[in-house]
Amino acid sequence: MKVTAAFAGLLVTAFAAPAPEPDLVSRSAGINYVQNYNGNLGDFTYDESAGTFSMYWEDGVSSDFVVGLGWTTGSSNAITYSAEYSASGSASYLAVYGWVNYPQAEYYIVEDYGDYNPCSSATSLGTVYSDGSTYQVCTDTRTNEPSITGTSTFTQYFSVRESTRTSGTVTVANHFNFWAHHGFGNSDFNYQVVAVEAWSGAGSASVTISS
């Protein structure tokens, strides 16, 4: 990704995708996946059976974290969530986040964000209208970066909501179908979560996933 000098150092970690961690939890029904990449950088708590999680982080976060709840195998099914999210002064996202195994890809449907819009420095693919708002769509190629298979080269896809929100239903299929015109596999899904990611500043989030 082409980035400005001001963000270059930050984005080394922010867009270095987390590999699976030993403390990821899987269960058999409903929400069955806990994303806990560097959750120790803040106060991460969750109730998997209730579909709720919270994350609080203080100024001085030294690395990237991605935390959330979801499913071991993603899909194009719609996701309904509600959240209280505060990230003013923080490089952070509230997003539907996941991976595709092949062709390997990392994806974000960004519902709200702090001080950094990832499409401000990535390759634009245009816009898609979904769930009451236009989303900016962009892509980037990550070369020899951490991934779900270790270190690899993969594509990132972003849809960034222009009318940001902290609750609603995400029609995931609208984004997958749009990205599919630009190389997104739209099948062979790895995990998928509603996530909070941050790599600077301070903030908080409390999220409930209802579907």
Swiss-Prot record:
Organism: Aspergillus tubingensis
Record domain GH11: where: 28-210
Taxon lineage: Eukaryota, Fungi, Dikarya, Ascomycota, Pezizomycotina
Gene3D superfamilies: 2.60.120.180
SUPFAM superfamilies reported for this sequence: Concanavalin A-like lectins/glucanases
Stored PROSITE patterns: GH11_1, GH11_2, GH11_3
Pathway(s) the chain acts in: Glycan degradation; xylan degradation
GO biological process, one term: xylan catabolic process
Leader sequence segment: 1-27
Cellular localisation: Secreted
Protein name: Endo-1,4-beta-xylanase A
GO-annotated molecular function: endo-1,4-beta-xylanase activity
Top-rank taxon, per record: Eukaryota
Family: Belongs to the glycosyl hydrolase 11 (cellulase G) family.
Gene Ontology CC terms: extracellular region
Record EC number: 3.2.1.8
Keywords per UniProt: Carbohydrate metabolism, Glycosidase, Hydrolase, Polysaccharide degradation, Secreted, Signal, Xylan degradation
One matching Pfam family: Glyco_hydro_11
Functional summary from the UniProt entry: Endo-1,4-beta-xylanase involved in the hydrolysis of xylan, a major structural heterogeneous polysaccharide found in plant biomass representing the second most abundant polysaccharide in the biosphere, after cellulose.
Catalyzed chemical reaction(s): Endohydrolysis of (1->4)-beta-D-xylosidic linkages in xylans
InterPro entries xref list: ConA-like_dom_sf, GH11/12, GH11_AS_1, GH11_AS_2, GH11_dom, Glyco_hydro_11
Name of the encoding gene: xynA
Keyword check for Signal: yes
Active site (UniProt): 106 (nucleophile), 197 (proton donor)
